[in-house]
A protein has these predicted regions:
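Short hotspots in intrinsically disordered terminal tails
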Residues: 9-10, 186
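DNA-contacting interfaces and partner/effector-binding or oligomerization modules
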Residues: 10-36
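Nucleic acid-binding interface residues in structured DNA/RNA-binding domains
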Residues: 15-25, 67, 76-189
């Protein structure tokens, strides 16, 4: 539930830490108590909410996040989520909350997510493109699993971290790749 996603206004000071994953370098960001960002270095929208000033300090939340990532990259499903602080529109937060609920090793389409949102809001339909924009701007990769979102027909559409990483993450989770395919022309939302 939304209780898992804490919206806390941290101080203005931001902190970063680095993590080396089998898929490349990852940067973690925090407001001092909660995780505010997790990006593959060089990915689209990298550090979108990072201020110019930050300190490289090994905070408790970074230790916890790295423990989560160690378990994850060892093919295990972590049974906890570090404290997250997300600042975004209500719409984006609602989309990211649905992402948190996609089970490990499974996928949902943009259409599935828009149907869930429409139902939540009592609407007939909801734009899958708007959902795509929210998914693409997810600031906490892997933990908020935007890599589990696919196109309506199993098309492995864009992933801010790159399609190779998306495929590698899904394979790591043992997802059924049989019904999924890579678009001829890679598109990232």
């Amino acid at each position: 539930g939304l209780g898992d996603v804490y919206k806390r206004q941290g101080g203005n000071m931001q902190y970063i830490s680095k993590y080396t994953s089998p898929l490349g370098a990852i940067t973690l960001a925090s407001n001092g108590e909660a995780l505010t960002g997790l990006w593959f270095d060089g990915q689209k929208y990298f550090g979108a909410n990072l201020s110019k000033e930050y300190k490289n300090v090994e905070l408790p939340v970074f230790k916890q996040t790295k423990e989560w990532l160690n378990l994850y990259f060892n093919g295990q499903k972590p049974d906890f989520i570090p404290l997250l602080a997300l600042q975004a529109s209500e719409f984006r937060l609602a989309v990211w909350q649905i992402l948190l609920e996609i089970p490990y090793g499974q996928t949902l389409s943009y259409g599935d997510i828009s149907a869930v949102l429409a139902k939540q809001k009592g609407l007939k339909t909801m734009s899958a493109q708007a959902v795509g924009g929210a998914v693409g701007h997810n600031p906490i990769s892997i933990i908020i699993p935007c890599h589990r979102v696919v196109g309506s027909n199993g098309n492995l559409t864009g992933y801010a971290g790159g399609l190779e990483k998306k495929i590698a993450l899904l394979q790591l989770e043992g997802a059924d790749m049989g019904a999924l395919f890579t678009p001829k022309k890679g598109t990232a939302l």
